[in-house]
Amino acid sequence: VGAGTSDISVTKDGSIIAYGMIPLAGDELTELIVQHYLVDFQTAERIKLASTTGEMITYKDIMMIEHSIPAKEVWELIEPVTDKMTTAVAEKIKELNGGQTVSATFVVGGGGKIHGYTEMLADKLGLPQERVALRGEEVLQEVTFEQPDIEKDPLIVTPIGICLNYYDQKNSFIMVHLNGERIKMYDNN
């Protein structure tokens, strides 16, 4: 669940069997916060992220007036959009899986950290809540960061996966010159 899209992969026996995308994700929530609290996009992002802690959130609106609100107020504001997002994601998952639900769902990305997201998705998929899990640290066990303050959470799972995929596949290509043009080709030995 990224900023602009929610991307979905359905797997079976360790392979991706279907892939889809819906244009609903975290930015929908951020834009709602922008409009409701009269803040800029960056402040709205900070409010959205801070709301995941369940504590008081302090911010300044566009008039530079300081406000403090409970995270629960943000949860109530974004709940209808979170409901819309999880409904669309569940429908797409079922569509990609031949019209039926899946056995389990792993959620990555910042949008999945939103209060109530995994619970709503589980409900719409007809799964027990423990079968819809937000993934983070447990899938990054083999990744070591030089900076000790980097938190292994759902926000970085996809970027790390892209980097590891590139690293694994970088030796699968060779560069050849054909008629004076450099071309990248797959090397299948």
Where are the regions a protein language model picked out?
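Helical "lid/coupling" subdomains associated with nucleotide-phosphate turnover
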Residues: 7-12, 18-43, 53-188
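Two-metal-ion RNase H-like nuclease active-site motif
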Residues: 1
